[in-house]
């Protein structure tokens, strides 16, 4: 028999709150396990999550959690947010909301920069990028549970073993979100998806949320650039190096100087550039950027079929590579000669 003033609805509501409190505790535990937050951040982070979920009270569950599964925990929180009308039930809006939640666990940009360069200067460039790559996954900027759905295999050919990938981690927009994007107010901020102003941006229906996005600030040939990872990971440690100034792609002598300056600082990475041409070139020609990573492609392993000599550059080894498209490989210990 129910006590006076207590209804079945009361028990249902209490059950819902107990479940959401468990999900909040699991997410905070995930932050602690992954090193995103410290023990002294526990109460602060819990309160920030309560605010985001429009909750004014919290009764901490007695159960302790470990090895928290991030995808299922976020799903629990998202389902609650949808039920309470805090967000719409589509992949675009759910992504906007869970990125907001993960942003509450993500260290400040200055903290990430300080940690990165501390590791770089006192240990090595590789230790620094290992830290940053793990952070970019732990914050859910790179969604591991989506990336693992990608299809990858090796195809033996006369040109060597080719890497074939089908990227399935980039979510398809649902019709409702597409319609909403058409009606949404057009904004010039950030100017594009590569701009530094994306760091911490809340996003909107036609622009992804980036509260959990972090960028390493560095100098390339004396100018301000940023280093980030691609959220879609086409290959291992797929990184993007971009000019902090929104300036168009141009392939000229200075572009090659910038590429060499990057590999000087990060010798364990490769770096390359798309063409600065529409359609056949990069997808964002309005913003100067290069792409790199910790990977060896089949073209880099392909043999030279025919050696060639460039007059005046006898200190440069050059040759035509055995490849289905026109490729010339140049190699020298003299960086200036290569440029």
Predicted segments with their positions:
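Active-site microenvironments that recognize anionic phosphate/pyrophosphate groups
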Residues: 15-251, 322-324, 339
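Histidine-centered divalent-metal-coordination microenvironment in nucleic-acid enzymes
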Residues: 236-243, 280-297
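Conserved His + Asp/Glu catalytic blocks
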Residues: 250, 270-271, 277-283, 294-339
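Hydrophobic faces of well-ordered beta-strands that scaffold small-molecule active sites
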Residues: 227, 271, 288-290
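Structured alpha-helical segments in the cores of large, soluble enzyme domains
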Residues: 225-231, 255, 259-263, 309-316
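Short, Lys/Arg-enriched N-terminal segments with co-localized hydrophobic residues
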Residues: 5-18
């Amino acid at each position: 028999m129910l006590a006076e003033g207590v209804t079945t609805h009361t028990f249902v509501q209490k059950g819902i709150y107990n479940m959401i409190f468990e999900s909040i505790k699991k997410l905070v535990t995930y932050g602690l396990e992954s090193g995103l937050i410290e023990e002294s951040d526990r109460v602060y982070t819990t309160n920030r999550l309560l605010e985001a979920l429009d909750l004014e009270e919290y009764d901490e569950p007695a159960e302790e959690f470990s090895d928290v599964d991030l995808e299922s925990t976020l799903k629990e929180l998202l389902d609650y947010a949808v039920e309470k009308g805090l967000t719409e039930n589509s992949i675009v809006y759910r992504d906007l909301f869970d990125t907001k939640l993960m942003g509450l666990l993500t260290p400040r940009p200055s903290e990430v920069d300080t940690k990165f360069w501390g590791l770089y200067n006192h240990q090595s460039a590789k230790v620094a990028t290992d830290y940053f790559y793990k952070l970019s996954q732990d914050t859910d900027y790179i969604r591991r549970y989506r990336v693992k759905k990608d299809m990858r295999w090796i195809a033996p050919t006369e040109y060597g073993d080719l890497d074939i990938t089908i990227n399935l981690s980039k979510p398809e927009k649902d019709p409702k979100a597409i319609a909403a994007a058409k009606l949404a107010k057009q904004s010039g901020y950030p100017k594009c998806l590569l701009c530094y102003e994306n760091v911490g941006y809340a996003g909107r229906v036609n622009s992804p949320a980036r509260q959990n996005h972090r960028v390493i600030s560095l100098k390339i040939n004396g100018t301000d650039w940023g280093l980030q990872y691609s959220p879609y990971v086409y290959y291992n440690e797929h990184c993007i190096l971009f000019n902090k100034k929104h300036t168009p792609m141009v392939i000229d002598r200075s572009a090659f100087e910038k590429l060499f300056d990057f590999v000087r600082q990060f010798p364990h990475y490769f770096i390359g550039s798309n063409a600065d041409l529409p359609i056949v070139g990069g997808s964002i020609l309005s913003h100067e950027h290069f792409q790199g990573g910790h990977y060896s492609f089949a073209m880099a392993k392909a043999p030279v079929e025919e050696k060639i000599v460039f007059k005046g550059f006898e200190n440069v080894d050059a040759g035509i590579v055995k490849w289905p498209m026109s490729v010339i490989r140049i190699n020298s210990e003299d960086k200036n000669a290569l440029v």
